[in-house]
């Protein structure tokens, strides 16, 4: 049961960072190298409590679908997306946001179990955990770049 923890500091208001983190459109941009598309549920705009999104993407040369649901929501402090169906045995991804001086700090906690028992544990050790960490880091770097520029206006309503 690996747990990935990340912390990212962003020079932008907490409300903006929170909303960018739940933007389906920004997520699509951050995962474009995996040809990730929102194919069902909320497919654009901002996702909210009890809403789902189904993503279609290619990871490890396999095209796959994953459906997640927002299972906790406290704007602008926290939201959780949890897997409903997909390649993992389960996952919960908690996103925490707090103001620290002039910065907003995102704290991600990605808690998951791979399928296939011991084989899944070996895959985690060899490549899955590092792949997931890299994806989350890339996504947060994009959120940071967009939140700290005027680009955020493309993703959030005025």
Q: What residue spans do the PLM features occupy?
A:
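Hydrophobic ligand-binding cavity/cleft-lining segments
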Residues: 1-44, 48
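Short, surface-exposed coil-to-beta transition loops
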Residues: 3-5, 63-67, 90-93
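Generic structural detector for well-ordered beta-strands
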Residues: 5-11, 56, 69, 96-98, ...
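Beta-strand elements of well-folded, non-transmembrane domains
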Residues: 10-12, 59-61, 72, 87, ...
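A short, structured loop/turn motif at beta-sheet edges
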Residues: 14-15, 72-76, 96-105
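Alpha-helical coiled-coil heptad-repeat segments used for dimerization/assembly
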Residues: 22, 134, 138-141
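Glycine-rich portal/gate segments that line the openings of hydrophobic small-molecule binding cavities
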Residues: 38-85, 105, 138-157
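Beta-strand/loop substructures that line and gate deep hydrophobic ligand-binding cavities in soluble
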Residues: 82-134
């Amino acid at each position: 049961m690996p747990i990935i923890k990340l912390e990212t500091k962003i020079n932008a208001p907490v409300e903006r960072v929170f909303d960018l983190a739940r933007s389906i459109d920004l997520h699509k941009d951050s995962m474009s190298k995996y040809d990730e598309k929102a194919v069902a549920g909320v497919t654009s705009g901002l996702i909210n409590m009890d809403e789902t999104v189904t993503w279609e993407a290619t990871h490890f040369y396999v095209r796959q679908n994953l459906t997640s649901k927002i299972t906790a929501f406290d704007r602008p402090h926290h939201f959780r997306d949890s897997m409903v169906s997909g390649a993992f045995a389960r996952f919960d991804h908690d996103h925490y946001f707090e103001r620290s001086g002039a910065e907003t700090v995102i704290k991600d906690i990605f808690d998951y179990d791979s399928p296939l028992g011991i084989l899944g544990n070996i895959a985690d050790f060899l490549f899955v955990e590092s792949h997931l960490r890299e994806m989350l880091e890339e996504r947060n770097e994009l959120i940071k770049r967009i939140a700290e520029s005027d680009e955020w206006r493309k993703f959030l309503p005025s």
